[in-house]
Curated annotation (Swiss-Prot):
Superkingdom assignment: Bacteria
InterPro entries with a match to the protein in the record: A-crystallin/Hsp20_dom, HSP20-like_chaperone, Small_HSP
Entries under CDD domains matching the protein: ACD_sHsps-like
Gene3D superfamilies on file: 2.60.40.790
Keyword Transferase: no
Keyword Transit peptide assigned: no
Record lineage: Bacteria, Pseudomonadati, Pseudomonadota, Alphaproteobacteria, Rickettsiales
Official protein name in the record: Small heat shock protein C1
Signal peptide: none
Source organism (scientific name): Rickettsia typhi (strain ATCC VR-144 / Wilmington)
PROSITE patterns: SHSP
Alphabetical keyword list: Stress response
Length: 163
């Protein structure tokens, strides 16, 4: 039973993603086919996780774009309604954390109105990102994060002695 927990967990986490897919054939999909497609998409995501150095992990539907240029990487995110005090960008090791949260509670006409809007991204950075000069700006609902690139010298291969 324990060996199935990761697959079950992955299916639960992404069920909303599969349902919202624009290219999914809902008419001809059977429940078994839907589960098989979901598992297949997770295997692909796991493959990307281990084979790509840069990977977005997202928990919301904020539109984002990653641009590679000669001297920098640029992350552009559409975050309408957020101001700079509601967005946090943090660097921890080789991971860049981007989070936004809006909570508003209004009492009008004897009724409680509550709104909560949030997003969370974790980005694994390439080796050539200059972590000391990362910058971010928010203008007209567009968050732009600049990741300057530096030249990375390849280390000489080191032979490991087998005992």
């Amino acid at each position: 039973m324990l060996k199935y927990i990761p697959a079950i967990f992955a299916i639960i986490l992404s069920s909303n993603i599969a349902i919202a897919s624009k290219n999914y054939d809902y008419i001809n999909a059977t429940p078994l086919r839907q589960v098989a497609d979901l598992i297949d998409s997770h295997i692909t995501n796991i493959d990307h996780l281990f084979n790509n150095r840069l990977m977005f992990y997202e928990s919301s539907s904020i539109k984002s774009k990653f641009i590679t240029k000669d001297k920098q990487y640029v992350i552009i995110m559409e975050v309408p309604g957020f101001d700079k005090n509601q967005i946090k960008v943090k660097l921890n090791g080789k991971k860049l954390f981007i989070a936004g949260n809006i909570e508003e509670k209004n009492k009008a006409n004897d009724s409680d109105n509550y709104m909560n809007k949030n997003f969370n991204y974790v980005i694994s950075l390439y080796e050539d990102v200059d972590q000391t000069n990362i910058s971010a700006r928010l203008k007209n609902g567009i968050l732009t994060i600049i990741l300057p690139r530096i030249e990375v010298k390849e280390q000489d291969a080191k032979e490991i002695t087998i005992n």
